């Protein structure tokens, strides 16, 4: 949304799960273990990136000082963690034997939930910044007029309560986003990537 006509600078930061934050999986697993289980995992192969609260704060603050407007900053979080491995390790660290004393139950992916997180789309160009753990991606930028046209179309579809058209318009605006485990996967076939 960074528009040359505007004095407002928009900077985006992308990162994975923040350890210890509200909704984080670790406190959720701790409660389930304390209650005697089972520990619930949505899929045996699901993976997620993790970072600490100080790392997340540092990314946001550094991005604010580095950004000129329109950039997307991504924190290097290392390798993603398999959530099943995390559940097993937390059970062991709590003094229990996984699957014997505390069971792990696979409950299935929630609608729209992905097996892996995409921090950057494939077309994004990643550049190193002066901070060794922060990269900058320069995605395709739309002019404000194009964005306004999309917003008008999306608002009109929303007023008609046409969820499918809302999602279709959003996919036209952000064609790199592909649905997974969603009723809108069929719309991905019709979306053309802008060049």
Enumerate the predicted regions with their spans.
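Strand-loop microenvironment adjacent to phosphate/nucleotide-handling motifs in alpha/beta enzyme folds
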Residues: 1-195
């Amino acid at each position: 949304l960074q528009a040359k006509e505007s004095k407002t600078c928009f900077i985006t930061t992308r990162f994975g799960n923040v350890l210890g934050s509200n909704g984080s999986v670790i406190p959720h697993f701790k409660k389930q273990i304390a209650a005697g289980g089972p520990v619930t995992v949505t899929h045996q192969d699901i993976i997620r990136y993790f970072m600490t609260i100080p790392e997340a704060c540092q990314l946001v603050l550094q991005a604010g000082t580095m950004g000129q407007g329109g950039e997307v900053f991504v924190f290097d979080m290392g390798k993603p963690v398999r959530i099943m491995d995390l559940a097993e390790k937390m059970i062991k660290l709590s003094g229990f034997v996984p699957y014997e004393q505390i069971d792990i139950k696979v409950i299935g992916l929630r609608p729209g939930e992905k097996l892996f997180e995409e921090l950057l789309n494939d077309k994004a160009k990643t550049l190193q910044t002066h901070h060794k753990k922060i990269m900058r991606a320069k995605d395709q930028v739309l002019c404000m007029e194009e964005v306004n046209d999309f917003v008008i179309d999306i608002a009109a579809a929303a007023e008609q309560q046409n969820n499918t058209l809302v999602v279709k318009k959003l996919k036209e605006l952000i064609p790199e986003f592909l649905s997974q485990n969603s009723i809108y996967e069929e719309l991905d076939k019709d979306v053309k990537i802008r060049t």
